[in-house]
Amino acid sequence: MTKRALISVSDKSGIIDFAKELKNLGWDIISTGGTKVALDDAGVETIAIDDVTGFPEMMDGRVKTLHPNIHGGLLARRDADSHLQAAKDNNIELIDLVVVNLYPFKETILRPDVTYDLAVENIDIGGPSMLRSAAKNHASVTVVVDSADYATVLGELADASQTTFKTRQRLAAKAFRHTAAYDALIAEYFTAQVGEAKPEKLTITYDLKQAMRYGENPQQDADFYQKALPTDYSIASAKQLNGKELSFNNIRDADAAIRIIRDFKDSPTVVALKHMNPCGIGQADDIETAWDYAYEADPVSIFGGIVVLNREVDAATAEKMHPIFLEIIIAPSYSEEALAILTNKKKNLRILELPFDAQAASEVEAEYTGVVGGLLVQNQDVVAENPSDWQVVTDRQPTEQEATALEFAWKAIKYVKSNGIIITNDHMTLGLGAGQTNRVGSVKIAIEQAKDHLDGAVLASDAFFPFADNIEEIAAAGIKAIIQPGGSVRDQESIDAANKHGLTMIFTGVRHFRH
């Protein structure tokens, strides 16, 4: 009995050669619409879908394959006599191979001129139905959704006139992933259209971006997936200009770095980062000086770190960066001379380019955190804050220089691991206390790191001070200005201590925990 294949594809890459080889192997081919036209024009003889169903395509192509003659041919179990008899009684011929990819819904909704009606018209119904029928009956039917599998299928058909069960099972799993991801993308689109903030089912889809050597540690397997609808300002979408593949830890650190730099849009800024914590942030009138400040903030910790700059990297800045061992440099652009300097004898240095003008769109994405047996979802900590809404709670008001430094410190503290303390002046970080289980411990660490640079320094805390002992430590170090959220039942004790030592202290009313 002549075997039959059904081919209906929107992506016609490689399909002509695939179909020709099928014909050479003695297969009949059923086809639809544009696929049939393409195959016929290439000299590949095909059977029209309406010759199989007995019905013409109708309703602008919405109904063409949803028919028992198609799905019966796909779903009939070859090992069940009753199925075969039912097919015979109803003049249903079996279909042994399905090659289908779906209407380009993703590509459609990514178009800047897409309308709601156009998006709806690009929701495939018949294609997923055929794929699911074929995949369910993978004991007998081969289903192909990816042109990368054409060669494997043809090779097995040429060798043994049929594919192996192992291949059919693998391709069935791939087909179910394909239809599930397709439906998830449609669900995501409609959820956004109706403004549903807390859907009872969370459906998101990601595509494999990179198979990784290992995860956070060598004993951990890992892979990198990118959103099906890519975010332009993201490490997943970054253009890599030089260096090795990014590691798991590289990606996490780089992601943290590009989040931090978003808050420093107004001035040339450089952020140096290590293990998800900023080790140096510098801000100036030009990017070279901003680098000087970021490097000076902690010339030890920057070794092996990640650096992100929010202006084009020029030759002068590149000359200063080149001698330092860095894992990654990220910037919106690089001058030709700067790129030549940075890549000289630095084949492993990862250099990334990102569209910084797309930062705003990246801020509206949800954050997902995996926990055992579940997933936490929250919006990003990108709340707009206006210093005019802050409250000076002490007798002494901040000086103009202190006010500028406190604003800088408050931007920086948001990305320090809790309990987080940061000491800065008005243009660079000076000391960092991160990840301690008590706040006074973080205060002591930050002061120790900044001890030689405390003249004119200010201090920021990501959450309130639970006890006045923090204020005593800060005052003893000679720091005169503090910014914190407030909100402790003992706030007055901290205020009294600050007044006693002549400190100025601001309450912002916004906490910035980061775990």
Curated annotation (Swiss-Prot):
Keywords: Hydrolase, Multifunctional enzyme, Purine biosynthesis, Transferase. It comes from the Bacteria. GO terms for biological process: 'de novo' IMP biosynthetic process. GO terms for cellular component: cytosol. The keyword Transferase applies. PROSITE patterns: MGS. It catalyses: (6R)-10-formyltetrahydrofolate + 5-amino-1-(5-phospho-beta-D-ribosyl)imidazole-4-carboxamide = 5-formamido-1-(5-phospho-D-ribosyl)imidazole-4-carboxamide + (6S)-5,6,7,8-tetrahydrofolate; IMP + H2O = 5-formamido-1-(5-phospho-D-ribosyl)imidazole-4-carboxamide. GO terms for molecular function: IMP cyclohydrolase activity; phosphoribosylaminoimidazolecarboxamide formyltransferase activity. Pfam families: AICARFT_IMPCHas, MGS. Pathway: Purine metabolism; IMP biosynthesis via de novo pathway; 5-formamido-1-(5-phospho-D-ribosyl)imidazole-4-carboxamide from 5-amino-1-(5-phospho-D-ribosyl)imidazole-4-carboxamide (10-formyl THF route): step 1/1; Purine metabolism; IMP biosynthesis via de novo pathway; IMP from 5-formamido-1-(5-phospho-D-ribosyl)imidazole-4-carboxamide: step 1/1. Residues 1-145 form the MGS-like domain. Its EC number is 2.1.2.3, 3.5.4.10. The IMP cyclohydrolase activity resides in the N-terminal region. Belongs to the PurH family. PANTHER family: BIFUNCTIONAL PURINE BIOSYNTHESIS PROTEIN ATIC, BIFUNCTIONAL PURINE BIOSYNTHESIS PROTEIN PURH. HAMAP family: PurH (MF_00139). This is Bifunctional purine biosynthesis protein PurH. It comes from Streptococcus agalactiae serotype V (strain ATCC BAA-611 / 2603 V/R).
